[in-house]
Amino acid sequence: MPFIGVQSYGWSLRHAAGWEARTWTLRQATEAAAADESKAVNTAFVRRFYDRIAPGLVDRFDGPAMLPLIAPRALLVVNGDSDPRSPLGGVREAVAAAERAYAAAGASERFQFLLEADAAHEITAEARAAALKWFERWLSPRD
């Protein structure tokens, strides 16, 4: 089953925290773009880089903007508390935005956030079990 962590690119840039681990996944592209601009890879450069490769990523299409759009449909968010690619502050910002949207839609029971202790950027047995239980609850045929 596919998983993707929730994050906030904008939070990482505003707090100068965590963008290094995320850009490491795009290391060759990041370094090539920095060389083209004769710039160091720093927070300001990374913001411009994100705007070049995915316009809107740090605002219109970031976690805090996108998660609320899923309401009122069922959504389970599972993140590790030690994921260097998804700093906890950004995760919490995205989750808080989703919680507000689900509450406003009268669908708070359709949103769940599971924060796994001591988990990094990985799919644990606990996450897999929680997802299966969630799928059974929300995707099973109704009588």
Functional labels for PLM-detected ranges:
Residues 2-66, 87, 91-95, 103-107:
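Mobile cap/lid helix-loop segments that gate and shape the active-site cleft of serine hydrolases
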Residues 6, 76, 83:
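Short loop/turn segments at secondary-structure transitions that flank enzyme active sites
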Residues 50-52, 79-82:
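Short, flexible active-site loops
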Residues 55, 72-74:
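Proline-centered helix-kink/hinge sites
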Residues 70, 77-79:
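Short beta-strand/loop motif that positions the catalytic acidic residue
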Residues 96-143:
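C-terminal catalytic histidine-bearing segment of alpha/beta-hydrolase fold enzymes
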